[in-house]
Structures are given as C-alpha cells and as structure tokens.
C-alpha cells in the first residue's frame, strides 16, 4: 500500500524519508511528491559507434560507452536544454532522495508532459530501498517538435510503498551498487554488471 500525502509528510517529519531540499506542502498531493528537473544532462553523440554489444567483453562495452556518451552538460539558470524528436538524453532531478531499507519509491512522469511526447523514464522507475542520491531521468521525445526543458520545472512525481520488512540488502549497503550517491546525470554503467 502506497503512502498517502499525510504519511509522506509524517515520514519526512520523522526523518525516516529524506528529500533535499524538502518539498513544500503544495508539492505533496494525494500519494505523490512532485520533483523538479535539475541542471545536469548527458546526451548521446551521433554515430560514433556502429553499435554497442551489450553482452560483449566489459572493456569493449566500456570503450563504446565512452565514445557515445557526452560529457556532463551543466545549464545555468534560465538556460534550456532542447530535446529533439527521437532523441534520448539523461538528466537528473533537482532533489536528492534518501530511502530507508523498508521503503521503495516509484517515479512517474507527468501526464501533461507525456501528452507532448516526453517520456521521463524509459523503463527504470523503481527507486530501491536504501537509495541515496539524485534520480537520473531517461528522457525520450516521442513527439513531433523539439521540447525546451528548463532546470526547476516540475518533471515527475514520486510515490512510496512500505515493504513487509527492511530489505536484507538495501542499495546503500550493496557492494555492486553502481549508482550509489549519484548527484549528476550518470551514464550507463552496464559494463560494471
């Protein structure tokens, strides 16, 4: 059963759940907390690799990822990131989230943005128990027009679901946690699998 707005506020007040900066009460509604777009992005460089063999040797996968991913792009206040039709880009939430071992989070895009063709997360919308850090967004523009995305705009909503008990292996204690404490638009680390 997901937490309602009153329970989300209580978990925040008690320090069991942390969202930094803490969202104002106007952004905690029903069963979600609205989150904003941060100022860090990453794109894919066009045609710098014929393909990426995801099951290939780790060093080859790593080299291919280095060739296709841009350096992190950091926008200043007032600047826009333009996502063109058919493009995939990574971005990050403005807020950092810390979940306890007995709570899982879910990120959903905003319906108003989806109706313009913007997918906020391509597939990965679960936030593991024990997560700590900003949330990387996997943007895809399936619409017909470029979309201007500006830091600070409302981009998605988080919901939270208590587990039957604390996870034995929460994300922050796993040795193989590839994205622990991420603060930027971290590229795929599939080569670390």
Swiss-Prot record:
Pathway: Pyrimidine metabolism; dUMP biosynthesis; dUMP from dCTP (dUTP route): step 1/2. Pfam families: DCD. Its EC number is 3.5.4.13. DCTP binds at residues 110-115, 128, 136-138, 171, 178, 182. It is an enzyme of class 3 (hydrolase). The active site is at 138 (proton donor/acceptor). Residues 169-193 are annotated as: Disordered. It catalyses: dCTP + H2O + H(+) = dUTP + NH4(+). Keywords: Hydrolase, Nucleotide metabolism, Nucleotide-binding. Homotrimer. This is dCTP deaminase. It comes from Cronobacter sakazakii (strain ATCC BAA-894) (Enterobacter sakazakii). The lineage of its organism: Bacteria, Pseudomonadati, Pseudomonadota, Gammaproteobacteria, Enterobacterales. The gene is dcd.
């Amino acid at each position: 059963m997901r937490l309602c707005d009153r329970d989300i506020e209580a978990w925040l007040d008690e320090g069991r759940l942390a969202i930094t900066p803490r969202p104002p009460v106007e952004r905690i509604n029903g069963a979600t907390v609205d989150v904003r777009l941060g100022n860090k992005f990453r794109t894919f460089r066009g045609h710098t690799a014929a393909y990426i063999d995801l099951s290939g040797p780790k060093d080859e996968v790593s080299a291919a990822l280095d060739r296709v991913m841009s350096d992190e792009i950091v926008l200043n206040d007032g600047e826009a990131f333009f996502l063109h039709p058919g493009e995939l880009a990574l971005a990050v939430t403005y807020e950092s989230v810390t979940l306890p071992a007995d709570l899982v989070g879910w990120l959903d895009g905003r319906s108003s943005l989806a109706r313009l063709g913007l997918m906020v997360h391509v597939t990965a919308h679960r936030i593991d128990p024990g997560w700590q850090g900003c949330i990387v967004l996997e943007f895809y523009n399936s619409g017909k027009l470029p979309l201007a995305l500006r830091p600070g705009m409302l981009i998605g909503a988080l919901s939270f679901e208590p587990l039957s008990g604390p996870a034995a292996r929460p994300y922050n204690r796993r040795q193989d946690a590839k994205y622990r404490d991420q603060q930027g638009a971290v590229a795929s680390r599939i080569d670390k699998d």
